[in-house]
Regions:
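Structured catalytic-domain cores with a bias toward divalent-metal coordination
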Residues: 1-259
């Protein structure tokens, strides 16, 4: 399975594919995929992501899409990921595949991380295992803004947004925004290990099967792809969702000790 594909925002549907071997002894090779329906060549899963945020490659003719896309260049770098486990890709992957490039900075997208067995991101084994492509992207791109898209069944709403979540699960409860979309922080495991305190790390939960949830989440992503910093997002939340912003900040300070 090729997990290192990157799609250029400037390419068309019949894009050229490029294998990046920058920094290695092997020479760069390029295969023209225009007009081809398949290829038997695979890149090593240990290859690094390209340092050039405008170079790109995608896996064609397949869905779900395991490829990575990078739009734009420069700072800030925003990394959005979706379809982290189970069948959540059905509600989230399409949102990242349709998003447009940012006006400034870089936007890196992993539309689908894994569609296999459901393993919670709160499980310490998730990111070193199933989510290792996320870790590799974070290590190499060093994003200031990191966003995960998840989806939930209505029966699990209380588990995610209930007031006793911290006592029962060990992490703060999600805040309810609009149209069934919930907002919280990402797993403490990845937040503490890979991001400085000034980074913006968010987790959205969409209600499964809800077009309204998808539309609202898409609007939030359009805002976040242009956000420059944690402080800017806090100001936006204070203006648009004051009650949720207050709760989120209090929960974060209680859990992490600072914001």
């Amino acid at each position: 399975m090729n997990t290192d594909r990157i799609e250029n925002s400037k390419t068309t549907e019949n894009s050229e594919s490029m294998e990046n071997s920058k920094g290695k002894g092997n020479s760069e090779s390029m295969e023209n995929s225009k007009g081809k329906g398949n290829s038997n060549e695979e890149e090593s899963s240990d290859d690094s992501f390209s340092d050039d945020h405008e170079s790109a490659e995608t896996r064609s003719g397949s869905y779900p899409d395991f490829g990575m896309r990078i739009y734009g260049c420069g700072r800030p770098v925003r990394l959005f990921v979706a379809g982290l486990h189970g069948d959540e890709w059905k509600d989230t992957t399409g949102l990242l595949k349709r998003i447009k490039p940012p006006k400034t900075g870089t936007l890196a997208l992993i539309p689908l991380v894994d569609c296999g067995k459901y393993i919670s991101t709160l499980n310490p084994d998730y990111y070193p295992g199933v989510g290792k492509k996320i870790v590799r992207a974070i290590e190499e791109l060093k994003p200031e803004i990191y966003v995960e898209l998840h989806s939930y069944s209505s029966k699990n709403l209380e588990k995610l947004a209930g007031k006793n979540r911290l006592e029962l699960i060990g992490v703060p409860a999600y805040s309810v925004l609009k149209e069934g979309v919930l907002l919280g922080s990402v797993s403490p495991w990845i937040r503490r290990k890979y991001f400085p305190k000034e980074s913006l790390c968010l987790s959205f939960e969409l209600r499964k099967g809800s077009m309204e949830s998808r539309k609202f989440a898409a609007c939030m992503l359009e805002i976040l792809k242009e956000i420059q910093s944690l402080d800017e997002f806090i100001e936006y939340m204070k203006k648009e969702f004051p009650a949720q912003a207050k709760k989120a900040m209090e929960d974060y300070q209680r859990f992490y000790g600072e914001i």
